[in-house]
Amino acid sequence: MTWTAPPGSRTRHGWNTPVTAPGPENREMLKRFREIQHNPLNFLLQTWQLHGDVVQFPIPRPASYLVSSPQGARDVLVNNHRAMSKRTIQYSTLSLVTGEGLLTADTETWKTSRRQLAPAFHHEMISLATNHVATALNRLDQNWAELTSEGSALIDVDQTMMNLALEITGATLFGSDLTGQVDQLTSATLRALHGVVVRARNPLPMPLAIPTPNNLGMRKAIRELDTAVNAIIDRRLADPLPPGSPIRDMLDVLMDQTLEQPLSRKQIRYEVATFIVAGHETIASALTWAWYLLGSNPEEAQRLQVHPERAALVFDETLRLYPPAWVITRRTLESVEVEGFLIPADALVIVSPWVVHRNERVWPNPELFIPDRFANGAPMLGYLPFGAGPRLCIGRDMARLQGAQILSHISQNWQLSPIHNQQVPVDASVTLRPQGGLPMRLTRIKD
């Protein structure tokens, strides 16, 4: 599937010189301020629908743009990636929790970390990780069997998928058994990320050292995460993998002191925290929404139960409708042209996969859950749940494989049914999560 500009649309080939992008006036922004704060997904979608593929907001510093076309997203993330920085308020605020890890780092720090982490995400390592997923799923089966020993049970799928994803992340990437810490770690993660969102949406955030209620909560959550991260590192230092071990997890790669540029203890902490916070939260979000969509589309749930190989299609379509990373931001280092429009240096550029994935030029009936869209693979343009370009998520292949494995296994053994037919509201936090959790009825599928 490919994307082409519709007749009469403005493309880079239609301009002799780039022009200024259109956008809403101050009055419209003031009227929609509450929506910006409380329903940013709808705000971004309607802004694109009202004003077009490249929109300039009436904000003087920094000049801010929304880019919503598939080609525009490619211009930002691929074609002009060297002219883009991650030094935005969103990533800077997140780095208060994770440090300058792979997700938030810029330029040389990112290049060093990416190069060093690459061996941990080779295909052989990803295949070996399926054993850890199987172990975690076996433990989940045992827990659910106890819950349903006298019939069905009501569970919070959101919390369950968070715990499962964290357990798998600990075993796969760090060789650590986190089963006794999942409740504490997921709680600390959610509280830290809540603090990130509050700060990012505050036009005048107070320095973290100022004891506001939000800052105090953030600092406490960060201390708890630091304690857990340092314990993971210390356990490996006390019990390292044997020299020359053919099986190397991410932590072993991070701590390799034989490299030309070995990472410092601080940088190792940053990367471990990044994958604990961002890594497990992302796959947990996708799995939660997959069960919501399957519960809302019982015919697709039945097809998955009969044909478990469809799990990859279900996972990919879930990532289209509910991309965990629903907004990607960049700051321009120099003026660039995007879809024929001029974006100046030092501007904030927003690319929202939530909006791009609802473009009818790429996705007919975009609001419908249709896993078969991916029967022939994803389109080259218009699908970016893991970003695009050099900053494409390093864990993409692992996340897709693990997501499909989890969906396939659970759908063969368990039925998750909605307890009501109402649409679940979306909490657009650092990732997309259901407001108030996702209660569903758990029933064992009889052999």
Regions found by a protein language model. Give the residues of each.
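Cytochrome P450 proximal C-terminal region
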Residues: 2-9, 17, 48, 137, ...
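N-terminal membrane-proximal hinge/A-helix region immediately C-terminal to the signal-anchor transmembrane segment
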Residues: 2-108, 112, 134-139, 179-180, ...
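Conserved cytochrome P450 K-helix E-x-x-R motif and the immediately C-terminal K′/meander segment
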Residues: 32-52, 308-341, 360
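Cytochrome P450 heme-thiolate monooxygenase catalytic core
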Residues: 2-21, 85-91, 109, 125-285
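Cytochrome P450 fold signature focused on the C-terminal beta-domain
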Residues: 240-247, 301-309, 321-340, 350, ...
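Cytochrome P450 catalytic-core helices
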Residues: 282-305, 397-412
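Conserved cytochrome P450 K-helix/beta-meander segment immediately N-terminal to the heme-binding cysteine loop
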Residues: 351-377
